[in-house]
Amino acid sequence: MISTANNQRVIVVGGGLAGLAGTVRIAESGVPVDLFSLVPVKRSHSVCAQGGINACNDVARQQGYSEWEHFDETLYGGDFLQHQPPVYEMAHWAPKVIDLLDRMGVPFNRTAEGQRALRLFGGSLYKRTHFAGATTGQQLMYALDEQTRRYEAKGMVNKYEFWEFLRPLLDDQGRCVGIVAQDLRTMQIRSFRADAVVLATGGPGLVFGKSTNSVMCTGAAAARAYKAGVKYANPEFIQVHPTSIPGADKLRLMSESARGEGGRVWCPAVKDDAGNWKPHPEPGKDPRQLPESERWYFLEEKFPAYGNIVPRDIATREIFQVCKDGFGVGGGNMVYLDLTHKPAEELERKLGGIMEIYRKFVGDDPVEMPMKIFPGVHYSMGGLWTTYTPGPDYDKIKAGQMPVQTPASGHPWDPEKRPAAGMDPNASNNMMTNIPGLYAFGECNYQYHGGTRLGANALLSCIFDGLFCGRSVANFVAEHADDPASSKPAAIFDNGVDAEEKIQNNLISSSGDENPYAIARELGEIMTRECTVVKDREGLEKTLTKLDELRDRFSRISVADSGMFTNQNLSWARAVGDMIDLADPIARGSLEREESRGSHYRTDFLQRNDERFLKTTVATYNPSTRKADISWEDVEHGIVTPRVRDYSKGKAKAANNGSKPDDASNHHDKSTSNGPTGATDPKDGVRAARPEQAPHAGAGQTIGSTTEPNT
């Protein structure tokens, strides 16, 4: 328990899973928390998460799974762009996180024996995803909100709902000592002192216009921190989810859990005399009348080991390409996600949430009719730059001084005896930005997912950030007990309020001829077209030119409503300017990363280039140009050697001889896989193949179990 003399306290901005978990952990440490949220916390975007949360448990362990496997497949899925210590720590904390949530009362689905049920999810051949139907995010949110209200009742948490973060406040040494925020009901702007500030504000989906994100997910808070001096990392890595429902207002997610539970992706097609697939002559024909011979299960055909549960960037590009090649439903931009072969009772029990969404917004019943889906912008792997302190064993492993006993060498992975190669739990800088005292948790930081996030790792990373790194925040507060925010000059806070009121007055008094809603629409259109599924130099340069135009036009906007009570036009107009500023590093990072890695796919640079780009993109805001200056930071990969990412077969496999293969970056299993090829079994959607692993970077040992999972 930390003593908080001098009225020390912490501000958490964002009431989603990362914000609530952090609030609970910090309050538990004895530090009072002021919790700010645009909406009532139970309405935060985390409630929209559907599929599940990844972790190893005893049942998964019986398949041959382990925390090490979770760690490795997360790196492999992310194309090795993550710093490895944070991912290592997260994978080993995952079982504890699930146990804690279970004790909090989260209604996880159960097996007949009472064990927590597990489902398949993208990027893994093991069932290791815990779930609560298809409303997992909502159930986790409600559990953490109950714990937050427990501390609220004790006077340790004050909620400021319907308040918007405007800027961080820094003292003369550059330390964050508070924020300026605005009451969205009265439009009052005021300052708040804090000894540390946590941003847990989610992703920038609205930068792309339509997305699966809630309409409040503008990325404005991260943009304001970025413009205040926080670096922004890997902005070009934007995840486009392969299965969403197009809508006039936004996109609605059809969870990856549908594929994990046996859903099959296909398009109407016929084979020519040479056996090649061709677009169907009647692409709009009732899918229920199409025989199996006229259904192209293209993911299962191209990726036999993983089938429909390949990682999202791969599935998205394949769907995008078959539609571009004329195979889409009705000749358009949709394919089928088919669950009609599954029992109705099972679908309602495991996927009831998304079934209800599809019926409501489309009008068809997925039990009877294959769903029509198309990829949609979903998640940002990039975010505010953060740091951490690695555990004491990391440098020894990196230098080859501490061999790691892995499953492949005949040693079961024991999480209790694991090397301390993750993050130091006693450090005060875990997930701190380059501004001391300012932290970033959840989707608005960049640490865990690299080039592509594996499904069901998002909820884990959010809650892990809050629970593990919340302790770092409390430690930072304790370290600065002799220099509290309460002792800082009033001018710091008054000047911040004055600056924000000036920005607001300029917006209200602006009498230009530009409509901020039209600017936002054009921004979303070009960002979606040029900065998502496929990219090239011409399109990215066109985007940067368009951003210059939009930036100029934004200076001439007119806000329709000049009132000072619940003025949503004013709040939106300001966010549009921030979205333009955040779009710049996304496009600029995409242009300067001349390779294809994870979700970043350049048609003019099709290969991954580790020599030049096994690095973090770091964007720094330049106030004079209002654009990003791009630099590069080496990625820490001292535990697992990066290797080629190839989901057409199991994960890369090395000889089990205790030494590195000649080429640790490119060694694939050329032998015939034991058992089924991995195509979906209509009965249960289970894979029988297993992924193999590459050697440990420090000790040169083969890592990965030789045991086939019993699924």
Regions found by a protein language model. Give the residues of each.
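Conserved redox-cofactor binding core of oxidoreductases
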Residues: 97, 102-188, 193, 200, ...
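Core beta-strand elements of the Rossmann-like FAD/NAD(P) dinucleotide-binding domain
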Residues: 6-8, 187-196, 434-435
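Glycine-rich active-site loop/strand segments that organize a redox cofactor
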Residues: 55-90
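N-terminal Rossmann-like FAD-binding beta1-loop-alpha1 element of flavoenzymes
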Residues: 9-35
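Long, amphipathic alpha-helical stalk/connector segments used for oligomerization, subunit docking
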Residues: 476-566
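An anion/pyrophosphate-binding glycine-rich loop and adjacent beta-alpha core
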Residues: 224, 230-365, 369-372, 403-418, ...
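Glycine-rich FAD pyrophosphate-binding loop
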Residues: 28-49
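Glycine-rich loop(s) and the adjacent beta-strand/alpha-helix scaffold that form part
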Residues: 196-252, 324, 329, 449-472
